[in-house]
Amino acid sequence: MADYLLNALQWIDGLGTWAAIAFMLLYTVATVVFLPGSILTLGAGVVFGVILGSIYVFIGATLGATAAFLVGRYLARGWVAKKIAGNQKFKAIDEAVGKEGLKIVILTRLSPVFPFNLLNYAYGITNVSLKDYVIGSLGMIPGTIMYVYIGSLAGSLATLGTATNQANPTLQWTIRIVGFIATVAVTIYVTKIARKALNEAILTSEVDE
């Protein structure tokens, strides 16, 4: 699959003024169908440079993530709802995410632990609003810039794999530390609001009884 994506990047590189649009469309589709976005992100650095590459990756990733979110919400939600019917814990967590969705989306976008493509569909079956979900995509910016920058160091698509060895170690460690902090933060935060939501759900059910 990596070879196909590299060939696609080579083709895009020769499109001239249409290259940006073709790249963003490819990235959008890749996000929806679970293709490895890392290759495209690194390749953007070679084809477009750091600034434009980062912009095009962000737009393509956001469009793809939004499309996957909508598919998860309107096409897969019914099936998932049947699977978790009667599960009070999921309902409580779902409601909690709906209340604090923006913060959670931003933190999970900053963290490298959460799989990007799968997470897009997972958010679709929660109560997080589309607005908060899209705004939360801003959390992708630091990682996007880093990987596009690393890709730009390769100089050509043929040597793309060697770019990671040339990257500034300080930059790499900075992004890793930010990602680690975000991972810890989102874990603690989700646990906290989930526990609060569960307690509220339990109290409500007791009052109803």
Curated annotation (Swiss-Prot):
It is found in: Cell membrane. The keyword Transmembrane applies. The chain crosses the membrane at residues 15-35, 39-59, 110-130, 134-154, 171-191. One of its GO terms (cellular component) is plasma membrane. Coiled coil: none annotated. It is a multi-pass membrane protein. Belongs to the TVP38/TMEM64 family. This is TVP38/TMEM64 family membrane protein slr0305. It comes from Synechocystis sp. (strain ATCC 27184 / PCC 6803 / Kazusa).
